Amino acid sequence: MKTLRLTYQLIAIPAAFSLSTCHTQSSQQQPTPPNIIYILADDMGYGDINAFNPHSQIPTPTLDSMASAGIMFTDAHSNSSVSTPTRYGTLTGRYAFRSSLKKGVLTGYSSPLIEKGRETIASFLSNQGYQTACIGKWHLGWDWAYIQNSQRKQKDVDFSQPIKNGPTERGFDYFYGIPASLGTAPHVYIENNKVTALPNRTIGPQKGIKLIRNGV
């Protein structure tokens, strides 16, 4: 039942606060909202974590500690088997198939999949007074800036300019991470809405190295 209390608490805090302003004589302090950590790992098996599988050969002491202090869900299901739609569903609470992406995943140059104005769990929590951050792989698209009067192809991206419609415009106060998968171009790190260092070379596809899919 702890999960229900958490859900109700997040929703009830604004209402409780507004009621307390009407009853100024009430000195009862509002409960402190809990910290929330959401980890989405690619290609992690159900039995990889010791908390779920005592015979696992992978040490996971921190995750085990989090599991013992919280609730373990033993019959949970993802709404997709691949990265992008899973992330879309997680952040928006919608079935992934309701997005414009009907198969596969986005690239590092794709436009935003989360529609402008669409509420996310990040924007919802931000409106409740939370400070929100996203660290790691985004893989939901954003708008790159392009060199003026160019053909607006991948080679024409202006990495010196800020990105638009990325994580910080979808509810997150802070972002540090990569556009898509590690093996997907462009290989740059983004902090908030700007690259941390301008790319200085291009590597084309190389035979036998499947991780470099379409060059840098």
Regions found by a protein language model. Give the residues of each.
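Formylglycine-dependent sulfatase
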Residues: K2, L6-Y8, C22-V216
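Bacterial N-terminal signal peptides
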Residues: Q9-S18
